């Protein structure tokens, strides 16, 4: 387990990121800070690619009992959220 996420979840996120040409995924929030509780959601920021298809495949097909909060950073995102992502974020996928 890496970043308080099961390896299977990381593999599935990577698979869908490649499938939909996502440039980068950043884990942020309590799981990135290491302050998460067992049932904390998974906050990810997504850059580039086919966001809509990626979003729905992750929501419907990634095998996890945890909820995902998925943010598309390429569109209007508050300055506060951008700062949190930059401060606490951990890159969990980056296109080669």
List each language-model region with its residue ranges.
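Catalytic core of pol beta-like nucleotidyltransferases
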Residues: 1-26, 32-38, 47-96
């Amino acid at each position: 387990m890496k970043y308080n996420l099961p390896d299977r979840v990381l593999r599935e996120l990577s698979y869908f990121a490649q499938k939909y040409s996502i440039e980068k995924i950043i884990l942020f929030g309590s799981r990135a800070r290491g302050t998460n509780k067992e049932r904390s959601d998974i906050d990810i920021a997504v850059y580039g690619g086919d966001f809509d298809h990626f979003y729905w495949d992750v929501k419907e097909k990634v095998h996890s009992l945890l909820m995902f909060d998925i943010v598309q950073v390429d569109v209007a995102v508050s300055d506060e959220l951008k700062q949190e992502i930059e401060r606490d974020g951990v890159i969990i996928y980056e296109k080669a």
